[in-house]
């Protein structure tokens, strides 16, 4: 199992491929090449179904990546409203600060996301 192939499936929303990796023993909390976990890649790319699947399989919703960015912050930075909504509904910590010292609320100008974070 190559990290690059797994990351491609995560980023591009290939749920069947992600399920296959997990069925073959891929750890949903393992840090991949690039210093990020699977949940970060899915959140970063707006892959809602992948996020739901990874969370169902026990992915740590508040795990930081190598830059101390959580999956919630990843989704906020990229403006993925549906991903932000899902992560919050599953208990993501909205008080965590990113490497810039800002919370998710402070880091976005997106009004829909701000409303969710209030």
Swiss-Prot record:
<comment type="function">
    <text>Regulates NF-kappa-B transcription factor activity. Promotes growth of cardiomyocytes, but not cardiomyocyte proliferation. Promotes cardiac muscle hypertrophy. Plays a role in the regulation of the growth of actin filaments. Inhibits the activity of the F-actin-capping protein complex.</text>
</comment>
<keyword id="KW-0539">Nucleus</keyword>
<dbReference type="GO" id="GO:0051092">
    <property type="term" value="P:positive regulation of NF-kappaB transcription factor activity"/>
</dbReference>
<dbReference type="InterPro" id="IPR036770">
    <property type="entry name" value="Ankyrin_rpt-contain_sf"/>
</dbReference>
<dbReference type="GO" id="GO:0030307">
    <property type="term" value="P:positive regulation of cell growth"/>
</dbReference>
<keyword id="KW-0677">Repeat</keyword>
<feature type="repeat" description="ANK 2">
    <location>
        <begin position="34"/>
        <end position="65"/>
    </location>
</feature>
<dbReference type="GO" id="GO:0005737">
    <property type="term" value="C:cytoplasm"/>
</dbReference>
<protein>
    <recommendedName>
        <fullName>Myotrophin</fullName>
    </recommendedName>
</protein>
<keyword id="KW-0040">ANK repeat</keyword>
<comment type="similarity">
    <text>Belongs to the myotrophin family.</text>
</comment>
<dbReference type="GO" id="GO:2000812">
    <property type="term" value="P:regulation of barbed-end actin filament capping"/>
</dbReference>
<dbReference type="GO" id="GO:0010557">
    <property type="term" value="P:positive regulation of macromolecule biosynthetic process"/>
</dbReference>
<feature type="repeat" description="ANK 1">
    <location>
        <begin position="1"/>
        <end position="30"/>
    </location>
</feature>
<dbReference type="GO" id="GO:0048471">
    <property type="term" value="C:perinuclear region of cytoplasm"/>
</dbReference>
<dbReference type="InterPro" id="IPR002110">
    <property type="entry name" value="Ankyrin_rpt"/>
</dbReference>
<dbReference type="GO" id="GO:0005634">
    <property type="term" value="C:nucleus"/>
</dbReference>
<dbReference type="GO" id="GO:0005829">
    <property type="term" value="C:cytosol"/>
</dbReference>
<keyword id="KW-0963">Cytoplasm</keyword>
<dbReference type="GO" id="GO:0010613">
    <property type="term" value="P:positive regulation of cardiac muscle hypertrophy"/>
</dbReference>
<dbReference type="GO" id="GO:0030424">
    <property type="term" value="C:axon"/>
</dbReference>
<feature type="repeat" description="ANK 3">
    <location>
        <begin position="67"/>
        <end position="98"/>
    </location>
</feature>
<dbReference type="GO" id="GO:0051247">
    <property type="term" value="P:positive regulation of protein metabolic process"/>
</dbReference>
<dbReference type="Pfam" id="PF12796">
    <property type="entry name" value="Ank_2"/>
</dbReference>
